[in-house]
UniProtKB/Swiss-Prot annotation:
SUPFAM superfamilies, sorted: Translation proteins SH3-like domain
Signal sequence segment: none
Protein name: Large ribosomal subunit protein bL19
Lineage summary: Bacteria, Pseudomonadati, Pseudomonadota, Gammaproteobacteria, Methylococcales
BP-aspect Gene Ontology terms: translation
Keyword Ribonucleoprotein found: yes
Matching InterPro entries: Ribosomal_bL19, Ribosomal_bL19_CS, Ribosomal_bL19_sf, Translation_prot_SH3-like_sf
Gene: rplS
Length: 114
């Protein structure tokens, strides 16, 4: 194992990430710095994509806010991501749910995994 892999495994071991995948509804607590104070901001939505690359892993969360679709890409092991909570498990048959971008209302619903 080279030095880069060793450092990445050390950084990854310091954070516990719950098991989640595409279709799951998650709440991501993100650190936001405003001036000299820092607070946590919650971003709740459906995971539409997940990229598993060790320390460089990322996932995309989509939500509809005031009738406008909002997507945000989070680096899984970023120090800005404080916590990830899984609200509900979605039953989907795709790894990437980009088709949800074109759907609205009831058509964008995802069945819950039993």
């Amino acid at each position: 194992m080279n030095i880069v892999q060793q450092l990445e495994s050390e950084w990854m071991s310091g954070k516990t990430i719950p098991a989640f995948g595409p279709g799951d509804t998650v709440v991501v607590q993100v650190k936001v710095k405003e001036g000299n104070r820092e607070r946590l901001q919650a971003f709740e939505g459906v995971v539409i994509a997940k990229r598993n690359r060790g320390y460089n892993s990322a996932f995309t969360v989509r939500k509809v806010s005031h009738g406008e679709g909002v997507e945000r890409v989070f680096q899984t092991y970023s120090p800005q991501v404080e916590e990830i909570q899984v609200k509900r498990r979605g039953d989907v048959r795709r790894a990437k749910l980009y088709y949800l971008r074109d759907r609205a209302g009831k058509a964008a619903r995802i069945k819950e995994k039993i």
